[in-house]
From Swiss-Prot:
Family of the protein in this entry: Belongs to the thiolase-like superfamily. FabH family.
Name by which UniProt lists this protein: Beta-ketoacyl-[acyl-carrier-protein] synthase III
Upper lineage: Bacteria, Bacillati, Bacillota, Bacilli, Bacillales
Keyword line: Acyltransferase, Cytoplasm, Fatty acid biosynthesis, Fatty acid metabolism, Lipid biosynthesis, Lipid metabolism, Multifunctional enzyme, Transferase
Organism this protein belongs to: Listeria innocua serovar 6a (strain ATCC BAA-680 / CLIP 11262)
Gene that this sequence comes from: fabH
Main location: cytoplasm
Amino acid sequence: MNAGILGVGKYVPEKILTNFDLEKMMETSDEWIRTRTGIEERRIARDDEYTHDLAYEAAKVAIENAGLTPDDIDLFIVATVTQEATFPSVANIIQDRLGAKNAAGMDVEAACAGFTFGVVTAAQFIKTGAYKNIVVVGADKLSKITNWDDRATAVLFGDGAGAVVMGPVSDDHGLLSFDLGSDGSGGKYLNLDENKKIYMNGREVFRFAVRQMGEASLRVLESAGLEKEDLDLLIPHQANIRIMEASRERLNLPEEKLMKTVHKYGNTSSSSIALALVDAVEEGRIKDNDNVLLVGFGGGLTWGALIIRWGK
């Protein structure tokens, strides 16, 4: 028995903030943002819309798409860095709202790599037989910690949530390999400043991302016994089109094997990879027996990569 994905779901706020909107708010331009990041627009949550609201909506859809009910869920794992409070956890809030009375809940925090950490954690519970059905959510409301006076970072971030239901699948499907890591010495390059707003040393983060995403991708390929050409789809953290293209080139993959949502969502941190995965499923980009590589990096500094063979 292995652990695989049984259903997916997402939620993004209604409000769209375009690059042209940002031109009216700060000294920037659509051309400058697009050429450097690939971002054209991002979603922004309402003031009264919180991370747990985003997570709840995505989880609800994922459970429905898996053909399950909240009573079938054993555990909720929510990857996020924008909890409204230290406790209760976002996972506990959505467990209550969904009426999933049989489930436990916990949050994991690995920034933009958080969803990969959540998926790998869920897989261990399933493979041991401890739990059967686990909901993993990546959700963040980055707009509340964005420094809107810093044009270098304000143009990057958006809000949203993506979710998957994980459960038992056959041995030759599901999670084939993973590589999680951290380099705490780089924590100073990406963190919250004294005003609890995002600070980023873009140059250092770029170097770290390109290096670690590339190396982690090669390691999970080797662990899974696969070659680069065996990959059917690459879903990287949607931070910046240049980093994403560097990941694709490191693997010698054609353009059509790179999943891109950065243009319409921006960088949504913990939900970035999850949202891209859900969009790939909804667009028919993933079919049974496809080998899908998820890879990301984040504040910490952290990285996570994994390969899933789609299907049961």
